[in-house]
Amino acid sequence: MNLVMALLTNTALASLLVLIAFWLPQLNSYAEKTSPYECGFDPMGSARLPFSMKFFLVAITFLLFDLEVALLLPLPWATQTTNLKTMLIMALTLISLLAISLAYEWTQKGLEWTE
């Protein structure tokens, strides 16, 4: 019973704080607060310019491959384990996954910058 009361109290308090944080800034809105900010200078253009979807997809692909390569970093220390065969199988599986992913991106023209 005490756990249920604590959970309900915490949920209610968290919900109340979220609602306050959402509605309180909307009550005090003025032009300077809603204007774009560019390093202390007056903005050169609109802050809501559209960006290239191709750039976004290449950036996401880079992040995914970067995270997968980061999984390869502990491999030199993993060679010191007693079960070397399992480590080699896992490493080759990860490298194969990277190669297959790169080949797929290449065939789908996901790495092409121009169309």
Curated annotation (Swiss-Prot):
Main subcellular localisation:
mitochondrion
Q: How does it assemble?
A: Core subunit of respiratory chain NADH dehydrogenase (Complex I) which is composed of 45 different subunits. Interacts with TMEM186. Interacts with TMEM242.
Q: Per its UniProt entry, which superkingdom is the organism in?
A: Eukaryota
Known catalytic reactions? a ubiquinone + NADH + 5 H(+)(in) = a ubiquinol + NAD(+) + 4 H(+)(out)
- Give the gene name: MT-ND3
| Compartments where located | Mitochondrion inner membrane
Q: Which family would the database say this protein is a member of? A: Belongs to the complex I subunit 3 family.
What is the purpose of this protein? Core subunit of the mitochondrial membrane respiratory chain NADH dehydrogenase (Complex I) which catalyzes electron transfer from NADH through the respiratory chain, using ubiquinone as an electron acceptor. Essential for the catalytic activity of complex I.
Query: What Enzyme Commission number(s) does the record list for this chain?
Result: 7.1.1.2
The protein, known as = NADH-ubiquinone oxidoreductase chain 3
Q: Name one GO cellular component term.
A: NADH dehydrogenase complex
> Is the keyword Electron transport in the record?
yes
Q: Where are the transmembrane segments?
A: 3-23, 55-75, 86-106
| UniProt entry tagged with the keyword Amino-acid biosynthesis | no
Q: Name one GO biological process term.
A: mitochondrial electron transport, NADH to ubiquinone
* Keyword set, alphabetical order: Electron transport, Membrane, Mitochondrion, Mitochondrion inner membrane, NAD, Respiratory chain, Translocase, Transmembrane, Transmembrane helix, Transport, Ubiquinone
Q: How does it sit in the membrane?
A: Multi-pass membrane protein
